[in-house]
Amino acid sequence: MTILGTALTPKATKVMLLGSGELGKEVVIELQRLGVEVIAVDRYENAPAQQVAHRSYTISMLDGNALKALIEKEKPDYIVPEVEAIATSTLVELEQAGFNVVPTAKATQLTMNREGIRRLAAEKLKLPTSNYQFVDNFDDFQSAVENLGIPCVIKPIMSSSGHGQSILKSKDDLQKAWDYAQQGGRAGAGRVIVEGFVKFDYEITLLTVRHAEGTSFLAPIGHRQEKGDYRESWQPQAMSVQALAKAQHIAEKITTELGGRGIFGVEMFVCGDEVIFNEVSPRPHDTGMVTLISQELSEFALHARAILGLPIPEINLISPAASKAIVVEGKSNQVQFGNLFEVLQEPNTNIRLFGKGEVNGHRRLGVILARDISVDKALEKVSRAYDKLDIQL
């Protein structure tokens, strides 16, 4: 039997969020709807989830001593990592001491870098993946490109939202691709994965929930990327019966190996009836923001339920839907959004503005959401709304 305490009382159920971006913000809101006390942590002040949490702290989460001291001070019932750049060895140590890491410290440690999860998927679980090599220096990088061929995909082993990722299309860009990967790593310069290019019809995120009563799958989400960063997503993505069955098999196999409870974003490439594993995140996925409007329970609500041991009897899709990321480039600490009346004029259209106070280069500041009678109609609707938005830096 699950018993939840009330926030800000001696018997409160406490969750500490490690990473406080826009996805974490939605998780905080869903936890607070269930009366949970939430502490949000990030490396910079006033991050989106910190703005809505009961308390917040700003530390380097790669500093194991600082992280351990904070967790021992707050003594949360659940520790919920929301980013990759965390001292995961400290989480392993704290889990062994009795703290509850969501979904598990092992899952957080393996998925924080692409090497751990790729070796688990391809070498231990024998899941279909692209060809790949890991490299530590420019000479080995050149050799890997020679072996895998051009085009190929270059990624830091630890990064998110497309940072440091590129598709190498010419040998003339070798140095540029290497330098970009070195600059984009969440923990600084270092090891890189070079992946053989996969020919695919489309990419999907299969959100997979491990909960008290088993494993459940959301309707597959299609998405479009630019420079490794999500720009649009839609649900459901049409798939053959065979491809969907293979995708669910892959997702169940990898999430079972990682263990614990919570939502996982399993990314895959699909070509006809064939499915190739790409990556997995043990947390809500940015492409899954479409579920804020497409489903009765969003990925964030499902994550909260799973963490707390609450039932998930079924997952209902309300209608086809789409999302479009609001991405800006420039420099400002006083961003404003205009024409919102026009943006929200059409029925079943919504917007989420993340509350990120500063732009210095390229940053995702919000998302536009819409439902319609088909995915194509929903994509057209979010594009129309996006075109009306006036962003002032």
UniProtKB/Swiss-Prot annotation:
Coiled coil: none annotated. Pathway: Purine metabolism; IMP biosynthesis via de novo pathway; N(2)-formyl-N(1)-(5-phospho-D-ribosyl)glycinamide from N(1)-(5-phospho-D-ribosyl)glycinamide (formate route): step 1/1. It catalyses: N(1)-(5-phospho-beta-D-ribosyl)glycinamide + formate + ATP = N(2)-formyl-N(1)-(5-phospho-beta-D-ribosyl)glycinamide + ADP + phosphate + H(+). Belongs to the PurK/PurT family. Residues 119-308 form the ATP-grasp domain. Signal peptide: none annotated. N(1)-(5-phospho-beta-D-ribosyl)glycinamide binds at residues 22-23, 82, 286, 356, 363-364. PROSITE patterns: ATP_GRASP (PS50975). GO terms for biological process: 'de novo' IMP biosynthetic process. Pfam families: ATP-grasp, PurT_C, RS_preATP-grasp-like. GO terms for cellular component: cytosol. NCBIfam families: PRK09288.1, purT. Homodimer. Its EC number is 6.3.1.21. SUPFAM superfamilies: Glutathione synthetase ATP-binding domain-like, PreATP-grasp domain, Rudiment single hybrid motif. This is Formate-dependent phosphoribosylglycinamide formyltransferase. Involved in the de novo purine biosynthesis. Catalyzes the transfer of formate to 5-phospho-ribosyl-glycinamide (GAR), producing 5-phospho-ribosyl-N-formylglycinamide (FGAR). Formate is provided by PurU via hydrolysis of 10-formyl-tetrahydrofolate. It comes from Histophilus somni (strain 129Pt) (Haemophilus somnus). ATP binds at residues 114, 155, 160-165, 195-198, 203. InterPro entries: ATP-grasp, ATP-grasp_carboxylate-amine, ATP_grasp_subdomain_1, PreATP-grasp_dom_sf, PurT, PurT/PurK_preATP-grasp, PurT_C, Rudment_hybrid_motif. GO terms for molecular function: ATP binding; magnesium ion binding; phosphoribosylglycinamide formyltransferase 2 activity; phosphoribosylglycinamide formyltransferase activity.
